[in-house]
């Protein structure tokens, strides 16, 4: 059996639409093994239990199947156990975690059974992006840290990873808002086909500032660097109270605030006490008519990990540069 942990992620971080992402220290654990019986059995505990056990709808299995096909390996029956801590369809990278977890677990299982090298980090990332359609969540889910990524038509996904500034934490507040239909498609559907040059320059300024601020540990710049005009103003109608929640977070001491991915969750970055920020954001959502709950977590410096035993972790991917 192999065990893999994979982190939640938050994409965009305000201005970096489909480009920026960060890994969060909230993890799903996936166990995978051959059973000797010609069948696929999926067990899910936590978020998604009762809805994700069908192999045809399970992203972990669908991703794993692609690895087996790529490596020419036919498992002798398959058991997948998922302990799901990442909320589903809340803007915290649940689909990216499932995809990356399935790829990494299947790769590790084939390595264990055959003794072969399996797929390297770059191959796994290319597969993850091909499944997900964009790199902003799957890159930090696989690699950890703060990531900048883009797609090149010739070279595929290109990325850089940065360690998150020390002491920075995330408060994620999840309103009880249901976005009709498929969440990501609905959230993209409200975006305009064109934006003004003024707004495009505004976002370029802040995306560049945000990357530099993270790289240099200038958390004092996050308030401005996480501002956006490209997607959040248009998605506000899908998240009642969003602007008030942003204002409440900043007034309570957050360093910066943004929609988490396509929403409806909102992420605030904090350096000191997280509780006042979480309470203020929850209250703002409640004032707007939505109950909400919050999670406070560290930013994850590591991405998907193969767990080699109780309490021990083994990185079976090529590691990014040492971050200290």
Curated annotation (Swiss-Prot):
Pathway: Amino-acid biosynthesis; L-threonine biosynthesis; L-threonine from L-aspartate: step 4/5. ATP binds at residues 87-97. It is found in: Cytoplasm. Coiled coil: none annotated. It catalyses: L-homoserine + ATP = O-phospho-L-homoserine + ADP + H(+). One of its GO terms (biological process) is threonine biosynthetic process. PROSITE patterns: GHMP_KINASES_ATP. It comes from the Bacteria. Its EC number is 2.7.1.39. One of its GO terms (cellular component) is cytoplasm. The keyword Magnesium does not apply. It is an enzyme of class 2 (transferase). GO terms for molecular function: ATP binding; homoserine kinase activity. Keywords: Amino-acid biosynthesis, ATP-binding, Cytoplasm, Kinase, Nucleotide-binding, Threonine biosynthesis, Transferase. Pfam families: GHMP_kinases_C, GHMP_kinases_N. The keyword Transmembrane does not apply. Its main location: cytoplasm. Belongs to the GHMP kinase family. Homoserine kinase subfamily. Catalyzes the ATP-dependent phosphorylation of L-homoserine to L-homoserine phosphate. PANTHER family: HOMOSERINE KINASE (PTHR20861:SF1), HOMOSERINE/4-DIPHOSPHOCYTIDYL-2-C-METHYL-D-ERYTHRITOL KINASE (PTHR20861). This is Homoserine kinase. It comes from Symbiobacterium thermophilum (strain DSM 24528 / JCM 14929 / IAM 14863 / T).
